Every structure is written in C-alpha cells, then in structure tokens.
C-alpha cells in the first residue's frame, strides 16, 4: 500500500522535476586484481544490487539507468531483474571512460527528465546522502 501512496504523491507533486539516476558500472575493477567489485558479495548480495536497491528506495528518483561493459550487459540486466526494483530500469552499454558511460546513459534518459543524478555503482551505502543531495535542489 505504501508504494501506491508514493505514486499518488509523485503525481500530486508536479513541481518536482523527473529525475533519472545514472549508475556508471563499466569500470574494469583493476585495483581488485581482476575480480569485478560490483559483483562481489556484500553481506549476501552483490555490491551493485545493494546500490540499485538504495537508489530505488529514494523517492526523488523516477528511473534508473545502468551503464555497464558489453560483456556484462546480460549479467547486469539479470541482476536488475532479481533486485525487485520498483522503478523502471534500463541497462545500456557504457564507454571506455566514466564520462562516456555517463553520456551513454544520459542519452537513454526519459525525455521528461529535468534532472540527471549520477551515482557510482560501487557505493551502496548512500541512501541518506543521495536523498539529502536531491532534497537540496
């Protein structure tokens, strides 16, 4: 029932811009010695899953766009499906740099997006800070 009220609140609040959360996740995890840090288990779930769930709980975000490496597109899409996210999620091919990944995701944002929030995929413990940052806008 809480999700229904969240949707009603969003419809009523027409002053808030549509927000697309961009999650760059195309890095090579070079400092991890070849182990992909985003898929590493953190207390029972991959780091990326925890990050996406935290963003999903943020009321001010309307959609999530994950930019990842080509070889991880299916893996990340499957992970997103297993997260039980409530917001629409897109998984897109990222670039060879963070800037290219952010651009690739931004180009896939909903045309209604008046705000793009970029958050690093490897930082799952963000919920309060992410929300506080968006609240100040």
Residue ranges and their predicted role:
Residues 27-30, 70-72, 96-97, 121-124:
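Short glycine-rich anion-binding loops that position phosphate/pyrophosphate groups of nucleotides
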Residues 74-79:
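Acidic helix N-cap motif at the loop->helix transition within catalytic regions
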Residues 84-96:
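Conserved donor nucleotide-binding strand/loop of the catalytic core
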């Amino acid at each position: 029932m809480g999700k229904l009220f969240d949707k009603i609140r969003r419809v009523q609040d027409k002053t808030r811009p549509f927000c697309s959360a961009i999650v760059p996740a195309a890095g090579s995890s070079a400092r991890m010695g070849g182990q992909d840090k985003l898929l590493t288990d953190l207390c029972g779930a991959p780091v990326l899953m925890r990050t996406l769930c935290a963003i999903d709980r943020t009321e001010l975000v309307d959609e999530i766009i994950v930019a990842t490496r080509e070889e991880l597109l299916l893996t990340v899409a499957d992970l997103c499906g297993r997260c039980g996210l409530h917001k629409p999620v897109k998984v897109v091919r990222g670039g060879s740099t963070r800037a290219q990944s952010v651009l690739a995701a931004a180009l896939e944002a909903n045309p209604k997006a008046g705000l793009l929030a970029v958050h690093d995929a490897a930082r799952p413990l963000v919920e309060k800070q992410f929300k506080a940052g968006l609240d100040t806008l």
